[in-house]
């Protein structure tokens, strides 16, 4: 639970999940999915979101199918060692999202710990997760049982603030799930989420870089 990077590195190596490169970076394989599975993402349609989501670009999922998937994944995890990280999505104290992430793979725990904001020691006793992600790459969804398109599924329930990820080892799904929840929660608070990077000039003027993933936003802002 909330292991530090050194301990996670050791577990990754002991379990054969990855190798360390000559530069000290952890190298892993994501399996058949080398990117996000946008066609396998489903959203539970409910009264609180039916008018606020662009459904032409989102697949609907019934609450019954979501609950069944949830219970099946919990049962599947009974005899597994899971890794848990309590983290914040966002840096602003007023708008950050307390998030708890359960992962089947140690390297997924390392990945998301690197991307989100660690809970400070003095904050741990009061940490109360508002959002939960359960990430089980080796669990295979059943289209007939769960209403999925394939064995891979990313199931989003905005009402319960839970995301279920199954059938994919691509860790970027975890990161995107945090963005998805923030994109839903922040606009009603008059905050506009943006997929961008920022740098600051010598006169304290700022520049914002927009672009699709991998187009160089972070490089330009570094």
Regions found by a protein language model. Name each.
Residues 1-206:
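A noncatalytic interaction/capping subdomain that flanks phosphate/NTP-handling catalytic cores
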Residues 200-222:
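Glycine-rich phosphate-binding P-loop
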């Amino acid at each position: 639970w909330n292991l530090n990077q050194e301990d996670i590195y050791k577990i990754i190596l002991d379990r054969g999940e990855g190798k360390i490169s000559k530069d000290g970076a952890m190298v892993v394989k994501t399996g058949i999915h080398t990117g996000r599975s946008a066609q396998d993402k489903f959203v539970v349609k409910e009264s609180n979101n039916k008018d606020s989501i662009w459904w032409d670009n989102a697949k609907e999922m019934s609450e019954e199918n979501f609950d069944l998937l949830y219970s099946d994944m919990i049962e599947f995890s009974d005899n597994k060692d899971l890794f848990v990280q309590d983290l914040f999505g966002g840096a602003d104290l007023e708008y950050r999202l307390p998030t708890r992430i359960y992962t089947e793979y140690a390297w997924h725990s390392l990945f998301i710990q690197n991307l989100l904001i660690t809970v400070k020691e003095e904050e741990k006793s009061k940490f109360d997760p508002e959002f939960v992600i359960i990430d089980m790459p080796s669990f295979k969804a059943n289209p007939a049982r769960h209403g999925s398109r394939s064995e891979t599924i990313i199931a989003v329930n905005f009402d319960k603030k839970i995301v279920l990820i199954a059938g994919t080892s691509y860790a970027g799904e975890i990161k995107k799930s945090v963005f998805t929840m923030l994109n839903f929660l922040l606009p009603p608070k008059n905050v506009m989420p943006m997929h961008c990077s920022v740098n600051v000039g010598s006169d304290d003027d700022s520049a914002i870089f927009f672009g699709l993933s991998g187009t160089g936003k972070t490089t330009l802002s570094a």
